[in-house]
A protein has these predicted regions:
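N-proximal low-complexity "stem/linker" segments adjacent to membrane-targeting elements
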Residues: 1-24
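Short, acidic, metal-binding catalytic loop of nucleotide-sugar glycosyltransferases
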Residues: 23-32
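A conserved acidic beta->alpha catalytic loop
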Residues: 36-45
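Glycine-rich, basic loop-to-helix element that forms the pyrophosphate-binding segment
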Residues: 60-76
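Short aromatic/hydrophobic "clamp" motif used to bind/position activated sugar donors
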Residues: 81
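The conserved acidic donor/metal-binding loop of glycosyltransferases
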Residues: 85-89, 114
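Conserved donor NDP-sugar-binding/catalytic core segment of glycosyltransferases
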Residues: 93-129
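Short, flexible, basic/aromatic active-site loop/helix in glycosyltransferases
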Residues: 129-149
Length: 149
């Protein structure tokens, strides 16, 4: 693997959120390699990628989330790959936290975090779906449950 960690952005059409996603990845306290993958190429995507120095990879064929995300994963040449959807924004310490967790858990294959929703410029931290997802991830946080054989 060429890189320790790669952010692989999945972009579709001309999303108004794409640039905020890119900026959040570029502003990481620990830099990671960034690529952009799309099955819906456009001059808008190309301009943003050029502005931020990000290589673009185009998947040909019908656009669908399964094949697009698999393509994004396979184009990333990294030990760890984060599939970043175009409307995701990452905390500036995300990559640092990932690499720190890797040092603590040598057999780590999945890294999961909490998240918040940005709606109309406000952070939503406690809606029903967020609490359900937190509950479902709880066994991953408890060592006794996450290392069952």
């Amino acid at each position: 693997m060429k890189y320790k960690h790669v952010f692989s952005i999945c972009a579709y059409g001309d999303s108004p959120y794409l640039e905020a996603c890119i900026r959040s990845l570029k502003e990481q306290t620990v830099p990671s390699h960034i690529i952009l993958c799309t099955s819906t190429p456009s001059s808008y995507i190309d301009r943003l990628a050029w502005r931020y120095g990000i290589p673009v990879y185009v998947r040909h064929g019908e656009s669908n989330i399964r094949d697009d995300w698999n393509f994004a994963y396979h184009m990333a040449d990294g030990e760890f790959v984060t599939i970043a959807h175009q409307d995701d924004m990452y905390h500036r310490d995300y990559a640092a936290s990932l690499l720190k967790a890797r040092q603590s858990y040598g057999d780590m294959t999945v890294f999961t975090t909490d998240y918040v929703i940005v709606k109309k410029g406000r952070l939503i931290t406690g809606d029903g779906m967020l609490w359900i997802k937190r509950l479902l991830r709880l066994p991953l946080r408890l060592h006794a449950l996450s290392h069952l054989e």
